């Protein structure tokens, strides 16, 4: 009896000590082992659990059963998703993996310190185009610095010549980036995206506006059609407009039996079918139209030829006049004509 009472007294203490290290593992997955303190706590709890199980096997089995019942009771408060994701065996395997430092989540490799310093050396207060030019220049200098130690071991390598060429190239690159910044090429790298987005937005807006207008016009047309049908159904035939009655009359075909016995039978029978005659002569009319078009074109060409010939004759006449007057300037007759008239007493 005493042994039974002692075991019953010791069971709650054992379950309490066993629940303490397992309490963090009952939380959601966000509490995975990531810190050293948490790993130490887990290892300490597992060691205590092993000590308790090793000291008394019967008590260990009873504690394991109590722990399973407690975990099942606590699992009722969890969502089905958490129950499916975090079973006890998987949780224990996670603990063992974390203690063995196996299958840990691997993070990305850190950036090279030179690259971070390269970005930090560029001021944030500069414009985007200026920062891009400075980044190009700094990248070239960084590449030269990293290339220099590899080339030192090569044969016939001159460090001074290499540095001189690198400095000259850096100066040329600086002038080139300045020129790109002045002519606006670097600014286009940041403006084209916004322009394309603005153009796409304006195009979408215009398309939506056109679609809206189309729907409005279609609705308006349907409304006018309904109004016309309503008017035609309500207005009697006597009050219809003259144009509509005329169209109706032209569409009606007269039955020949209505005028067979009339006095105008012979006249109507001898009346030629002008519509048929015109339809038969459609080909002739088409040829006449082509001939008239050709005549009109030839007349236009003759008019243009006459205009060109008159202009050419005027030009030739002006040239002949100029040449004839130039020849008369050196003639003695023209010089004599240019002499002033002498006074009358001298002639006497």
Swiss-Prot record:
The keyword Flavoprotein does not apply. InterPro entries: Dsn1/Mis13 (IPR013218). One of its GO terms (cellular component) is nucleus. The modification Phosphoserine is found at residues 25, 75, 79, 107, 123, 331. Residues 87-104 have a biased composition (Basic and acidic residues). It comes from Mus musculus. It comes from the Eukaryota. This is Kinetochore-associated protein DSN1 homolog. Component of the MIS12 complex composed of MIS12, DSN1, NSL1 and PMF1. Also interacts with KNL1, CBX3 and CBX5. Interacts with KNSTRN. It holds the Pfam family MIS13. Residues 1-105, 325-348 are annotated as: Disordered. Part of the MIS12 complex which is required for normal chromosome alignment and segregation and kinetochore formation during mitosis. GO terms for biological process: attachment of spindle microtubules to kinetochore; cell division; skeletal muscle satellite cell proliferation. Residues 33-46, 70-86 have a biased composition (Polar residues). The keyword NADP does not apply.
